[in-house]
Amino acid sequence: KQSMLTRNNILFSERVFTSELGRTQGDVMFMPSPLNHATGFFHGLISPLLLGGRAVLQQDFRPREAIELMNAEGVTWSMSATPFIYDMLNVLDAEDGLAFDTLRLFCCGGAPLPPALIERAARYGVLLCEIYGSTESCPHVFVPPEKCAEWNGAWSGVPFAGIEVKVIDEAGNEVPRGAQGEEISRGPHMFVGYLNERDRTDRALDDEGWFYSGDLCYMDGEGRIRINGRKKEVIIRGGENISAREIDDDLIGAPGLANSATIGMPDARLGERICTFVVPSDPAAPPTQDDLIAYLRERHVAKRLWPERIEIIDEIPVTATGKVK
């Protein structure tokens, strides 16, 4: 899917993003994410341009070199997925004398922040700030820097100024505070639709401008939001959304495979990795992970969609309506 955003969408989003995070012309941004990704383009290019500041880019992310580069360039803040800061903290833990000389704020998107990671970063003088959003609804929820230590991963944040967020039930009604429902948002930052996909656009974006994220959350009396699940069958691997159903569809026809069900398995570095449960055609000769990868490679399926672990099972449990339990 290709999300369409206007110039005004992007400019509003980045102006409120930099303002609420207290960024100024004197700040130096480090961007390890690819510039063809929303994170890299919005925050690595547009934000520094609007501030009149500097951006430091790294062609291929290598944690030790990244730390040295940031120190040499006086980097003060960064924005990327959790694995980037996770890897750099591992380097700092392993090497005496190496530190973040100037980095003070690292914004993390793509997945909730574990409290233990926030505490590790704080020991090196860095605030980890959780950011929530998507390409369609650019970052629109954040933890204010002054609240990072206090909230310590308990909340995904509050909406940026000028952006509305609601939590609704299956019927589209707003739920009481503290009750779980689907997160929806609207504002000047919102995309205008998917390129050449009218039906998909209509499912995601209603006539009043609300975007239906498919993410589950709850909101407290102060308007703080906690993302705590997903309606959609999505695996968040290193900040990238991967469709579990797409992986199972790609595996259809693989030799020795009768059925499969893919889920995200917890991972300390990436948040989740791809785990596929496999029902073999012949229990005496189940396919291996290498067999499945070879099949996907032959079909030119992107490597990011390859199972990273498989589990052989007798059958996949389903509900009365045929949905995987």
Stretch-by-stretch model annotation:
Residues 70, 78, 187, 192-193, ...:
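AMP-binding/adenylate-forming catalytic core of the ANL superfamily
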Residues 11-28, 36-77, 91:
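Conserved AMP-binding/adenylation subdomain of ANL enzymes
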Residues 50, 72-80, 89-151, 164:
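Gly/Ser/Thr-rich phosphate-binding loop
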Residues 158-162, 173-204, 240-242:
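Conserved ATP/PPi-binding loop(s) of AMP-dependent carboxylate-activating enzymes
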Residues 166-184, 203, 221-222, 283-289, ...:
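Conserved beta-loop-beta connector loops within the AMP-binding
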Residues 2-4, 31, 53-60, 129:
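Short beta-strand->loop structural element characteristic of the AMP-binding/adenylate-forming
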Residues 110, 133, 157, 172, ...:
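Active-site glycine-centered loops adjacent to acidic/histidine catalytic or metal-binding residues
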